[in-house]
Regions:
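An amphipathic alpha-helical interaction surface
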Residues: 62-209
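Terminal, low-complexity, charged helical segments
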Residues: 2, 36-53, 76-78, 82-84, ...
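N-terminal, helix-rich and Lys/Arg-enriched segments in bacterial and organellar proteins
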Residues: 7, 25-42, 99-102, 110, ...
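Membrane-embedded hydrophobic alpha-helical segments
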Residues: 1-25
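Amphipathic, membrane-active segments
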Residues: 19-61
């Protein structure tokens, strides 16, 4: 009987360790992806500023924000906005980012999971808004050429200014999410959860606001 109980206890401990290792791997992979996106955003945030001008460099900004391993496959989508194949690739990647955002809430505890979720969700929403805006710019350009309109007239016809404000709102949302995730407190919580073995203090600190 003792041998059976010992074997059961060992099996339980092995399973627990295996689950802990699996959770650690999921956290590590998601955090590495998130950190790379944070680095890309940090390098290019200076280019994402509201202005009264038509956002003709929108495609360039999109290319900068997708210049990372996890997003490079959709970079060319901004130059092929009406191509069905590229549209599919973009939507699949944005769906993946939404799934990662949701996953963060479950595999990271407390506010750290929410902060990662907010950042990933805001990032994919901005990419989609930039893609939509590029369609608008192309439509506006084609209209101006076909009907011999000025840039200002074409902008008015497609309500570019209103759409531009929506783009800026998405930029502001990502900026706020980045600031939230960049705080020392949140990053400290994430770092503690990246350990395979947590001390009692780590566990308490993780749940403290």
């Amino acid at each position: 009987a003792f041998a059976a109980i010992s074997a059961l206890a060992i099996s339980f401990l092995q399973m627990r360790q295996s689950n802990r290792q699996a959770l650690f791997s999921r956290r590590l992979n998601l955090w590495l992806t998130t950190e790379k996106l944070m680095d890309v955003y940090s390098e290019n945030a200076k280019h994402l500023k509201p202005s009264d001008e038509v956002q003709l460099a929108n495609d360039l900004s999109f290319s900068w924000l997708t210049n990372t391993t996890s997003l490079q496959e959709i970079g060319p989508a901004i130059s092929n906005v009406l191509d069905g194949e590229w549209q599919l690739k973009l939507h699949l990647k944005l769906d993946e980012m939404r799934s990662q955002a949701s996953e963060a809430r479950y595999i990271f505890k407390g506010n750290s999971g929410l902060a990662i979720c907010h950042f990933l969700d805001a990032y994919q929403k901005l990419l989609f808004k930039m893609y939509q805006h590029q369609i608008l710019i192309k439509t506006m350009s084609d209209m101006a050429q076909e009907h011999h309109l000025s840039l200002k007239e074409a902008c008015a016809d497609v309500h570019e200014e209103e759409c531009r404000e929506e783009l800026f709102a998405a930029q502001d949302a990502l900026s706020a999410a980045y600031r939230e995730l960049s705080t020392r407190k949140i990053r400290g919580k994430i770092k503690r959860q990246m350990r395979l073995v947590n001390t009692p203090k780590d566990i308490v600190d993780t749940f403290l606001s």
